[in-house]
């Protein structure tokens, strides 16, 4: 079984059966986003497949999930483009990574959703066993954040932000 098949098996074990998949390409980079509709109540969860192929560029062997509750098509495009940005910039990817400028991807996205950035962290809302595949591939979670949340992170750091989320059971 190859790595892609192991990742898919892992997703289906924890997220359920996927209901669809879309392929995204940007230059030399190719990723897929799988959709899972039963992971979180009233949300569609996107899960990347292919980020781990570029682990040498971002110093991290990983895949990322992102639950969204509205505007699924546009959210998928924004999420995929944020992942491409991580790859193109060869960012040192991990917990606390933030991608700003969502309106550069889809005009007025921030205004329509009151969200201005994507925040990446550990997949704390799922069982701990979800967080790794075979001790070398890490699973992250992403979510949209508001301007106010972004400002909080810039002022106090990701540790304080995540403490706040934990205290509020977000």
Question: Which functions belong to the PLM regions below?
Answer:
Residues 1-61, 65-170:
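Acidic, proline/glycine-rich low-complexity IDRs
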């Amino acid at each position: 079984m190859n790595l892609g098949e192991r990742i898919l098996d892992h997703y289906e074990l924890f997220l359920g059966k996927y209901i669809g998949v879309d392929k995204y390409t940007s230059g030399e980079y190719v990723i897929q986003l799988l959709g899972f509709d039963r992971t979180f109540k009233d949300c569609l969860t996107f899960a990347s497949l292919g980020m781990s192929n570029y682990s040498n560029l971002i110093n991290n062997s990983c895949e990322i999930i992102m639950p969204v509750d509205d505007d699924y098509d546009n959210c998928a495009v924004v999420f995929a483009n944020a992942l491409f940005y991580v790859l193109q910039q060869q960012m040192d990817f991990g917990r606390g990574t933030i991608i700003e400028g969502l309106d550069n991807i889809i005009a007025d996205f921030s205004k329509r959703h009151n969200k201005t950035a994507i925040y990446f962290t550990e997949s704390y809302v799922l069982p701990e066993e979800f967080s790794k595949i075979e001790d070398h591939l890490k699973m992250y979670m992403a979510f949209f954040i508001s301007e106010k949340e972004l400002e909080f992170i810039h002022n106090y750091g990701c540790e304080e932000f995540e403490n706040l989320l934990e205290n509020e059971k977000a």
